[in-house]
A protein has these predicted regions:
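Class I S-adenosyl-L-methionine-dependent methyltransferase catalytic core
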Residues: 1-222
């Protein structure tokens, strides 16, 4: 699908390395009407929802108090008439369920302690200082909760990557996919590469022609 591929290219370095067109491409490809996002970040996937062909309802949360009001301003600016149901609390603590069964849950959580956007005690890197606690008490709890809200035939998709921390690689992708594999009715559909530009923190050999990409893992609930 050439249109979908074009939406997965990130032509310049952006904060968070996420592109609203990627979200729009995912929503349109799966013809999703009801969408959830448990780490809203800078509102990129909210923008993709408002631009999508099929999106009608967006259920999301992010604990960052500095961005919450801006989500509403952003949505009002688009003036699409679509419904949003957003919250300002940690995803693992969110107890209010969505109003509708979810077609796709698509998110890009912070990569353990690599992304630190605000110094608030509700941030996952502040709450969970080891990778084991971050996975078990934050990621797995959030994934399980969202999985329960996804309708049969719906999709869970996550943009996540392993990270280099103090000179050692931290394995994030494998534990998350292994956990998803244990959930009732889970079926691995595959992964897509979201092309990213060179980060200021990445050094590449000048004689090597290569592209950088981050994976989006896609699972279906049967």
């Amino acid at each position: 699908n050439s249109e979908l591929k074009s939406m997965f290219r990130l032509g310049m370095y952006q904060a968070g390395q996420f592109k609203a067109l990627t979200a729009k491409g995912m929503y349109d490809y799966f013809q999703a009407e009801n969408i959830s996002d448990m780490s809203m970040g800078w509102g990129d996937r909210l923008a993709g929802f408002n631009a999508s062909k099929h999106g009608k309802y967006y259920y999301g949360t992010d604990p960052n108090t500095l961005t919450y009001n801006n989500y509403h301003r952003q949505h009002d600016f688009y003036d699409t008439g679509k419904e949003i149901d957003i919250h300002c609390e940690p995803s693992e603590d969110l107890t209010k369920p969505p109003k509708h069964s979810i077609d796709i849950s698509f998110t890009s959580p912070p990569y353990f302690n690599r992304e630190q956007y605000v110094d608030e005690d509700t941030q996952s890197f502040m709450r969970y200082v080891t990778i084991d606690s971050w996975l078990n008490d934050y990621m797995f709890k959030t994934i399980k909760q969202q999985w329960n809200y996804i309708k049969s035939g719906g999709v869970y998709a996550i943009n996540i990557s392993n990270i280099l921390n103090k000179g050692e690689w931290v394995n994030i992708c494998d534990p998350i996919n292994e956990y998803l594999n244990t959930l009732d009715g889970s079926k691995y559909l595959g992964h897509m590469g979201m092309k990213i530009a060179k980060s200021p923190s990445i050094q590449l050999r000048k004689d090597v022609d290569c592209s950088l990409a981050e994976p989006i893992f896609v699972w279906q609930k049967e």
